Amino acid sequence: MAKGIREKIKLVSSAGTGHFYTTTKNKRTKPEKLELKKFDPVVRQHVLYKEAKIK
């Protein structure tokens, strides 16, 4: 079977709480780093989440 093009990534909270979401992204169509506003349940606010690699 062929290797999939989608890469697993981690979206880490910029609030510094350590909270993160995991998702996948197509590295061929979106080579830049993802930045999304999502809800951080630790601070109970919508904050910016930035892409980081899953180790």
Swiss-Prot record:
Q: Which Pfam families match?
A: Ribosomal_L33 (PF00471)
Query: Which UniProt keywords are present, listed alphabetically?
Result: Ribonucleoprotein, Ribosomal protein
Question: Which family is it part of?
Answer: Belongs to the bacterial ribosomal protein bL33 family.
The entry's protein name is: Large ribosomal subunit protein bL33
Q: What is the name of the gene encoding this protein?
A: rpmG
Task: Please give an example of a GO cellular component term from this record.
Answer: cytosolic large ribosomal subunit
Drop me one GO molecular function for this one.
structural constituent of ribosome
Disulphide bonds in the chain: none
A GO biological-process term: translation
Tell whether Ribonucleoprotein is among the UniProt keywords: yes
**Per the record's keyword annotation, is Ribonucleoprotein included, yes or no?**
yes
HAMAP family registered for this protein in UniProt: Ribosomal_bL33
Q: Which organism is it from?
A: Cronobacter sakazakii (strain ATCC BAA-894) (Enterobacter sakazakii)
